[in-house]
Amino acid sequence: MKKLIILFFLGIYAFASIAQETDKIVGVWWNEEKTTKIEVEKKDGKYIGTIIYMIPEKYENGEAPKDDENPDPALRERSLIGLQILDGFVYNADKKEWKDGSIYDPKSGKTYDCYGWLESDDLLKLKGFVAGIRWMGKSSEWYRTTM
């Protein structure tokens, strides 16, 4: 009976550790250029990221930049503030990475498959790629910050 109780508590501890690990990506991050803040949150079991702030130098005539490069002309007038640029990430505990996601690049108007991992608690590395070829893509570093 003692062994069962010990195994039960070890199982709970292991589950709690994995749960904490999966949510480490949640928070606010500066993009690589430190011009944009992205809030990463968990929604419906997946991780998403939304632009919440851009430095004032990015504004023109007091207006936030628009999604000018979007391939859909109907979306080019929408503000980048509030735009979801990360979508669909799930945590892979074996590889300690968030995978199966996508990232939208407002500079090019393109969406890429993407995965990410934490180099440290304050450094998130993301890699966008096409055609399922992970090694052929572009990497980006994001830095944890506050609102």
Q: What are these language model-derived features?
A:
Residues 121, 130-147:
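Edge beta-strand at a domain terminus
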Residues 29-31, 99-106, 126-129:
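Short beta-strand segments that buttress and anchor functional surface loops
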Residues 34-37, 84, 109-114, 135-139:
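Short, surface-exposed coil-to-beta transition loops
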Residues 37, 46, 122-123:
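Structural motif
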Residues 22-36, 51, 100, 142-144:
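Tryptophan-anchored aromatic micro-motifs
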Residues 1-21:
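Bacterial Sec-dependent N-terminal signal peptides
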Residues 42-44, 51-53, 118, 128-130, ...:
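A mature extracytoplasmic/lumenal domain signature
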Residues 41-107, 111-112:
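Central antiparallel beta-sheet cores of small beta-barrel/beta-sandwich binding domains
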